A protein has these predicted regions:
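Active-site beta-strand->loop->alpha-helix modules in alpha/beta enzyme cores, enriched
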Residues: 2-22, 26-107
């Protein structure tokens, strides 16, 4: 199998991670992010989570910062949408995502 190179120490790569719940990114992309960092890739990571109130939000922030050790410019944002009611918050979630798109330009 041929290896896929997604970043290097010479060139920065901006990665957008989007999760609905506080551990979705870690479960879905954590291994890839850790491998890229361990391989010397220079990453700027924008980590967005839709739900994380109270203790879950604190846990999500701590976990994100732990995963992002070695990342040059991590940006972690935990929104406070109620994960039990995403379907009824569709408009608000889309507006939030649109506002994030104005400030984030991933590769």
């Amino acid at each position: 199998m041929r290896a896929l190179s997604l970043g290097s120490a010479q060139e920065s790569l901006c990665v957008l991670c989007l999760g609905a719940h506080s551990d979705d990114i870690e479960i879905g992309a954590g291994g890839s992010l850790l491998s890229l960092v361990a391989g010397g890739a220079k990453l700027d990571v924008v980590w967005l989570v839709l739900s994380g109130r109270g203790a879950r939000g604190d846990e999500a922030r701590a976990s994100a910062h732990s995963f992002l050790e070695g990342v040059a410019n991590p940006i972690v944002t935990i929104a406070d949408f109620d994960d039990s009611y995403f379907p009824t918050q569709g408009r608000e979630i889309k507006e939030w995502l649109a506002s994030q798109a104005k400030r984030v330009k991933p590769d």
